[in-house]
UniProtKB/Swiss-Prot annotation:
Consists of 3 domains; the N-terminus binds the ribosome, the middle domain has PPIase activity, while the C-terminus has intrinsic chaperone activity on its own. This is Trigger factor. The gene is tig. The lineage of its organism: Bacteria, Bacillati, Actinomycetota, Actinomycetes, Pseudonocardiales. Residues 458-467 have a biased composition (Basic and acidic residues). The keyword Cell division applies.
Amino acid sequence: MKSTVEHLSPTRVRINVEVPFDELKPNFDRAYKALAQQVRIPGFRPGKVPARVLESRIGRGPVLDEVVNESVPAKYLEAVNSSEVRTLGRPDIEVTKIEDGDVIEFKAEVDVRPEITVPAFGELKVSVDDVEVTEEEVNEQLDELRARFGTLAGVERPAQQGDFVSIDLSATVDGQEVEEAQTSGLSYEIGSGQLIDGIDEALIGASEGETRTFTTNLVAGEHAGKDAEVTVKLNSVKERHLPEVDDEFAQMASEFDSVDELLSDLRERLGRVKRMQQGMQARDKVLEALLETVEVPLPEKVVESEIDVRKHDAIHPFDHDEDRFGEWLEQQGQTREQFEDETREEAEKAVRTQLVLDTIADAEDVSVSDNELTERIIYQAQRFGVSPDQYVQQAQQSGQLGAIYADVRRSKALFSVVRQATVTDEEGNELDLDELFGTQAGEEQGEQAEGTEATDEQSAKADAKAE
């Protein structure tokens, strides 16, 4: 087999391939066998028809078609593997010549990874926010903990912000009942933002047994993007009484004996969270600085594919109804043209990022261990609420396992860059990135474990209190 590569642009090549017939004997053998199973000829059992008899019956054309359809994709991959190009996406293949008994020629045009020159990573400099835990933030955490152990008591007054209410809901669109919006005895905290727009304004000031109506725009379901007239009936109103902050509360809500110990722990937890946020901010800013310094030719077909994926994800909640999606965009104050422009901009940035990080991963010889891949799979499975086995099965069926591997590899490449960059806080102090990122994974695991233990203990105490 002979193959040559023509560079059409920095991101696209044409691969020309010539395959002599003497390399195709196995393909002809399989073609005769497959076609013999499909043809019934008197005097021969299925699959046992000699090649010359088969050709005399069906002609040479179907045999050549079978050989071409099987051999060309395989020979294309062979040509790619023997070249130095790194292909992206599917090729456009055209068979240009079939000379029976001599040669098959075809050409394949495909996007390729462009040559990218990256800067010295030590030259990258970014600044991130300081890590400072304020008393206000500690008190917010304390109030959230108090709320978990609060008690609800009925009140005889109009509903107000922060009250817990029981309500009945119904809605109509253009006079038609919206079945999925009908519910009774729904518990809701006014001001939590967990229900539809306008519900809080309708409930505040209402008295027990009162019914009110308001108009809102539905964001999901069959009527997404349409205005609905909603009727809400207020069944009951309760207010939450928070426990006093004293040593008794600390003992009830945590493993600590005093309020001072509890506050110290809350402050420490907030500090760990902020250090992780600082690390993520450093990562994001280094990536932005890196992209600003690198010239990246973009493979157009790869960009178009990324745009298609993003458009599909955007319109999917509207059952791929273009009209409903257009109405929703209008309600968001966005035109279709603006959406198209933003989607292209995001897609181009995503492709640019992938290409740069892949180049760095190659240069830094980044590898992904089985444990690292397993950790990512477990994390993704938890995000989507499925078991790791189910997630792997779905990823295999959709051909996404390779993408997961590539994503982990790119993440490792980026952190390699971040470690070599210069990162300072707002006062100009250089951060110890080895200390930050070297302990980050362990801190996250420790925090998750501590958080689980604290949650379990607090839940158990709350349950005991309820009993």
